[in-house]
Amino acid sequence: MKLFGTDGVRGRAGEKLNAMTAMRLAMAAGIYFRKNSITNKILVGKDTRKSGYMIETAIVAGLTAVGYNVIQIGPMPTPAIAFLTEDMRCDAGIMISASHNPFDDNGIKFFDSFGNKLSVEAEQAIENIFFHNEIIENNQKIGLEIGQSKRIDDVIGRYIVHIKNSFPKSLTLKGLRVVLDVANGAVYKVAPTVFSELGAETIVLNDEPNGGNINDGCGALHPENLAKEVKRLRADIGFAFDGDADRLVVVDENAKVVDGDALLGVLATYLDENKMLDKKEIVATVMSNAALDDYLAKHKIKLLRSNVGDKFVLEMMKENGINFGGEQSGHIIFSDFSKTGDGLVSALQVSACLLAKNKKASEIFGSIKAYPQKLSNLKIIEKRPLDELKGLKELEDELKKLGIRTLFRYSGTENVIRLLLEGKDEALVTKKIAEVEKFFIKALNE
């Protein structure tokens, strides 16, 4: 059994992710982090799901059982945990959240002492300890060696100051009418405070979490409700966050949802114009539209592509000394300000871009038009290595000659292959996706 997925441990609360699993996972993580412990403190935060109380209690029990002292800070965004772990000199940070998933799911994410997500090797080491009964039993403490926990409620101020410092001091949000959809999630207190203190006229939606309404018809996965309010209130811009606020979706003044690649492209050129781009390079994933490549090329900015997942975006950024990157889905990383995707930092940078250019959002983001794409999720019998499929290379070469970009990858959780074709000629792309489907049906189902 494998515990860790692409972003920590995640599952239905009370089933796959129950109290026993959470406690044992915390014990395993505590044992792992104790090897290089400096302060013997671990920070624990959560989003607004009801199951967070159960999981938080189990995690505290597991960590204190192996001798760790725990600092509980309550509902806070995931990027706040990354920042505060380093800022408060903790050995590690733990975030209890299932991000954009429904309320009955939950998850556990880990950060090292520098606020970075754990490497695959570190996750594997924790997983090995989790399944090793003898190691777990031998590392439980007794007497005064048992850890203790305390709750601190005022750390929100540290994070708010940090976020506000990412906004240019030469600008003010005064006169900007902003609508925020905080998704009944972890950012429900922080986001309105930040925008109001910077001078914006701030209207807030979905800021009454009750444990079961996080992401429920609201937030980054449902920007249509935000769009209606932006139009009704004649706002300048709207921002929607997901449950743990590491993702951002933007709505312009005409109630149109801004394409994620347009967001990346415009922000990259804004940073470059203001000498905030360390290199004339950014990182996106293989899912980003080729229109982004072409737009950046006109501005002499190179696009590097990573695998899907903000963890892989960040890895490539670090490897290449790049300070900006992100995903089409709205995970955007400004590494000068945050160690992970931070929806609030992104929202402030978008606002700064609007003010600096003195233009409407629709004018700025409408300059990048995505090329037509066709996506297909094909059910298959077996997942054979793609490089072993006879005729696939020839098919890809033929499509490339026709100006069509291809991306074929298996689902990580089900017997499905995801097919993507992209090109400037929509009719041709539509015709060719049918041919590609036939190829894979024959190759993987016969």
Curated annotation (Swiss-Prot):
PROSITE patterns: PGM_PMM (PS00710). Pfam families: PGM_PMM_I (PF02878), PGM_PMM_II (PF02879), PGM_PMM_III (PF02880), PGM_PMM_IV (PF00408). InterPro entries: A-D-PHexomutase_a/b/a-I, A-D-PHexomutase_a/b/a-I/II/III, A-D-PHexomutase_a/b/a-II, A-D-PHexomutase_a/b/a-III, A-D-PHexomutase_C, A-D-PHexomutase_C_sf, A-D-PHexomutase_CS, Alpha-D-phosphohexomutase_SF. SUPFAM superfamilies: Phosphoglucomutase, C-terminal domain, Phosphoglucomutase, first 3 domains. One of its GO terms (biological process) is UDP-N-acetylglucosamine biosynthetic process. Activated by phosphorylation. One of its GO terms (cellular component) is cytosol. The modification Phosphoserine is found at S99. Binds 1 Mg(2+) ion per subunit. It comes from the Bacteria. Catalyzes the conversion of glucosamine-6-phosphate to glucosamine-1-phosphate. HAMAP family: GlmM_B. This is Phosphoglucosamine mutase. The lineage of its organism: Bacteria, Pseudomonadati, Campylobacterota, Epsilonproteobacteria, Campylobacterales.
